[in-house]
């Protein structure tokens, strides 16, 4: 772990920093809690509770900003939700805190060494931002057209699926809105915005979770 006073690498077993002699007893407790929250987030991410994972990871980083495992996972969660810009932001910060032996290098290179992927990301973000601006201005038809392009290009962009659903709801096309929300929920199962919109449509927010459990049981039976 890093000393909170001088930033020097210090043994987790030590009571004082070997470099500046700062007492790190209390700080070790914070680091331990930070790691616990990271493990909680890792579990939530595995069951696709990405929103819950984000909450745990942000709390983890508040306790220990040097927790690069937590920051890298936060970037991966954002990336899984289609928010590549935020993902890159977290990996850049992670690299600043830990220059050597950092998985953030690998994640960033996957994007930076693929110009077509970066161009795709930039195009999607521009369309989303334009669609969002048009929706706020009341130009719903234009916004709808832009958001349809966004989710077609990047189906896992949760925020875009939610906004498109909201636009469909505004038009009274609840069936299409529900389809967008179910797609968003399959990516992030407990997203509060998605659950709220589903409730407004009078739909069961647990349906995706139930479908997933049934699929797991069927797969188990088939293997037997």
Q: What feature does the model see in each segment?
A:
Residues 9, 30-63, 123-149:
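Alpha-helical segment of the N-proximal tetratricopeptide repeat
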Residues 21-30:
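Short Cys/His-rich micro-motifs in 6-15 aa windows
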Residues 25, 61-62, 93-96, 151-152, ...:
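Conserved structural position within tetratricopeptide repeats
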Residues 34-35, 68-69, 102-103, 124, ...:
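Helix-start (N-cap) detector for alpha-helical repeat units in TPR-like alpha-solenoids
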